[in-house]
Every structure is written in C-alpha cells, then in structure tokens.
Amino acid sequence: MIKVSLISLGCAKNLVDSEIMVGHLHQAGMAVIPEAEKADVVIVNTCSFIDSSKEESIGHILEVHQHRGLRKRRKEQKLIVAGCMSQRFSKDLSSSLHDEVDAFIGLDQVTKVAPIIQEIYARERTKTDDPVSFVEGRSTFIPDYDTPRFRLTPKHFAYVKIAEGCNHPCTFCIIPQIRGRHRSRTVESVVAEVRQLVREGVKEINLISQDTTFFGMDTWEQRPNPRTPVDSGRGTALTTLLRQLNAIEGDFWIRLLYTHPAHWSDELIRTIAECPKVARYIDIPLQHISDAMLSRMQRETSGGYIRDLIARIRAGIPGIAVRTTFIVGFPGETDADVDELCAFISETKFERLGVFRYSQEDGTRAAKMPEQLSAKTKEARWHRTMALQKQIAADVSKTYVGRTLRVLVEEPGVARGEADAPDIDGRVYVPRELPVGEFADVTVTGYHDYDLLALPPGQKPAQWKVARQAQ
C-alpha cells in the first residue's frame, strides 16, 4: 500500500482542496499518514497569494527534499507540489526546483491525485528529466456534494466551498489568474453537503469562496457586473442559499466568510437578520477607505458607499460583529490616505480587523504602478493601524463583560463565540470541563485585548482554572 503524507498551506479554500485530495487517496486504497518521514509520497499543497506565502511554500518543499536525503529509505520518496503556486508557476519552478520535485499538479487535478501518483511510479525519471507537470490551463473544477472528501478540521466545524474562482478586477490580486472565473455550485449541491455535515454532528458551517456574495449570479440570464447587488429576483443568489440552509433541521451556526462589499444589498442584510442560524458575524474585506486608493485598487466601491453600507448592516442586523481587512502601503498611498483610514477605523470601531502590508505581486497591474512604497513605510503604517485596532479590540472586549454568550467549545478550556471565526479571531477561555465540540452558555467575566474569559452562569472564578494559553 502506498503511504502518502500531505502538507496543507494557505487559506481555508486551499484546505478544502487538501481534504478532497485526501478523500480521493482513501478511495483509491492509499494510506494517508501525518508523518512525512514515513511516507512514500509527500504532497505539498501550496499558497501563492503574496510573497510571504510563496516563500513559506518553497521553504516546505526544500525541507521535505532535504529530509528525504537524510535517511536511506526516504531517497526513493516522491515529492509532488500542488495548489496555487503550482498552478501559477509550475513552468518556472520546474527548472528552479528540478532536483527537488517529481511532479507538479494543478487545481483541476485534486480529484486525480491517485492515478497521478501511480503514473509517477510507472515512469523512470533520469537525472536530466524535468519534473512531470500535470498542470492544465485556467482552472475550471468545482466540487460537488458527493465529491470524496476527508475533513481535516475538528469534528465540530467544517468549511463548505460554495463557489470557485473570481470575476473581480482588483489590481493587487493574482487569484483570478490562478483559480479562473467565478463558478457557483448549485443550491441543491450545497444544501445536500451541509445537511450531511449536520447529520455527522458538525456545529458550525463556514461558507467560503473567493467571493461568497457573487454566489449564483454567474447563472443569471442577464449578466451581472462587479457592482451588481445580491438580488434573488434576478435568479439564484446568496440569499436563496442562506434561507435554504437555515431551514435544515439541527442546532448549528452558518458563518459567512469572504463577502465583497460591492455586492451587498438590503435583501442580503434582511435575510441574515431573519435567519437565526446565520451567525451574527460577517467577513467583509474593505481594503481601504480613501477614494484614491479604492480607485487604484479597482475595488468597485467608494468611501461614501462603504460608510453607508456599514451603517446599514449594523442597523439592519442587531448585534452583528463586523470583520474586515485593510491593505496599507499600496502604490501611491499618501500620509493623508493613511490618516483617513485611521480616522475611519477609530470612528467605526470594527469588532474584528486585520491589516496586510501591500505585496507587489508579479502579474498584477498594481505591480507595474508608479510610486511603489518602501518596506519601511509599509511596516510603519502597519504598526500604526494595528496599534490603533488593538486598543479598539480591548474596548470592544470590555463591552462583553457581564453578558451571557453562546460559545462553541474548541478544545479543553478554549471556546469561540458567534463573533469569532476559526483560526483568525479571538478566543473565549472557559472551564476545562465544558464538553469539546458542543455549545455552552457562559457569562463573560473578563478580557485581555482580543480574548475573553467566561464562566457558566452562577459559577464563581475560584471554581476553575484558566486554560494554559491564557495565563
């Protein structure tokens, strides 16, 4: 039996691709093991969103190659590179990683990984042969509800990819060139998958894609544009999906990630407010507030539009936690642009916020723009905005003290609230005896920046110990 070890890097969307590969390997009778040193084949599922992601991916590839030369039994081990970096740069990497890599596979080969492994073993590669590339053109694959998949997340939460690809023209982003144009799954396919996950005991469904708000629009008879609002009157839309998911029997959260501000509509706001299973949490990357920056980024929004949208979301969905991300150091960004961004962050007080330093990515229009900023300037602006948000986060956390929250227990002593997505947001530290993978009601007793401390109602602090991570 061939033993395969898989290293998954990058975002949750890449993790789903890894889960699909593992599912197909199991179906083909291959063993998937966590220890790379014991595997016959190692697959590195790479990320190439920004330079640091590519560097991390290449670092893992080189580490696997280095280790397989240290032990006699690993010298015949095969190394396969998959994922976004392979899809985008396989031709370039074929020469630079000639000695390290046996094969490159693209995004459309995640369901073909087992026969590809068998083909690699059937070939006799000489030292002068280039690595085999199975990468095809622009990706067109999209998973279905019955696509074999082995979940790599804890049993109580899952990521569900509702679409693939992106139609947005953001000047800083390479993703549309890697993952292709937007293509939605059917509502029936997503509902079938979620229903099965709930049957298996999943308590949190995280909906993901490059742009979840564009779901269904690619099937409309009248073609939408990058600013078309969610509107079920024109055809299948995200609101259609959310209402059908909300109707599934069971006790679970539906969390909406990766929304685009240009597509938000009053219908979407109303739908979230009317669907109790949809978490009072939204992920809406805004990227900037300066009109000049939004125009150069080609974000299809304006500062005025964004301010109005956030106000409408908060008014229409009481108790909503808004998560966003911004980019600082974009070409041409001035001190005045950063001042405006910081003022906006201060006045809006986002419940959750992250900041990226702009990364000059080959193949993007922004990479060729004049007025590229220095790494020192980017770093200073990142520190300024994050320091501001750290204080805001503490102020937001303070408002939770004394409130009762429903949390999902992640591990002994650690939980997440409705306002906390997996991996990217804060934690709620709770007594260790609360059952993992289940919901619990707790009262917040304290906080530390982004994290909360909480107890079951009526329990006194002396009756429990804080989880080690919080000490």
UniProtKB/Swiss-Prot annotation:
UniProt-annotated binding residues for [4Fe-4S] cluster 2: 166, 170, 173
Keyword terms: 4Fe-4S, Cytoplasm, Iron, Iron-sulfur, Metal-binding, S-adenosyl-L-methionine, Transferase
Catalysis: reaction(s): L-aspartate(89)-[ribosomal protein uS12]-hydrogen + (sulfur carrier)-SH + AH2 + 2 S-adenosyl-L-methionine = 3-methylsulfanyl-L-aspartate(89)-[ribosomal protein uS12]-hydrogen + (sulfur carrier)-H + 5'-deoxyadenosine + L-methionine + A + S-adenosyl-L-homocysteine + 2 H(+)
Keyword Metal-binding among record annotations: yes
The protein's name: Ribosomal protein uS12 methylthiotransferase RimO
SUPFAM superfamilies: Radical SAM enzymes
UniProt subcellular location: Cytoplasm
Domain Radical SAM core: 152-395
Main location class: cytoplasm
GO MF term list: 4 iron, 4 sulfur cluster binding; aspartic acid methylthiotransferase activity; metal ion binding; protein methylthiotransferase activity
Cofactor note: Binds 2 [4Fe-4S] clusters. One cluster is coordinated with 3 cysteines and an exchangeable S-adenosyl-L-methionine.
Any one GO BP annotation for this protein: tRNA modification
The gene coding this protein: rimO
Homology family: Belongs to the methylthiotransferase family. RimO subfamily.
Matching HAMAP family: MTTase_RimO (MF_01865)
Lineage summary: Bacteria, Pseudomonadati, Verrucomicrobiota, Opitutia, Opitutales
Residues of the MTTase N-terminal domain: 2-122
Function in brief: Catalyzes the methylthiolation of an aspartic acid residue of ribosomal protein uS12.
Family matches, as NCBIfam families: 30S ribosomal protein S12 methylthiotransferase RimO, MiaB/RimO family radical SAM methylthiotransferase
EC code: 2.8.4.4
InterPro entries from the UniProt entry: Elp3/MiaA/NifB-like_rSAM, Methylthiotransferase, Methylthiotransferase_CS, Methylthiotransferase_N, Methylthiotransferase_N_sf, NA-bd_OB-fold, Ribosomal_uS12_MeSTrfase_RimO, rSAM
SMART domains tied to this protein: Elp3
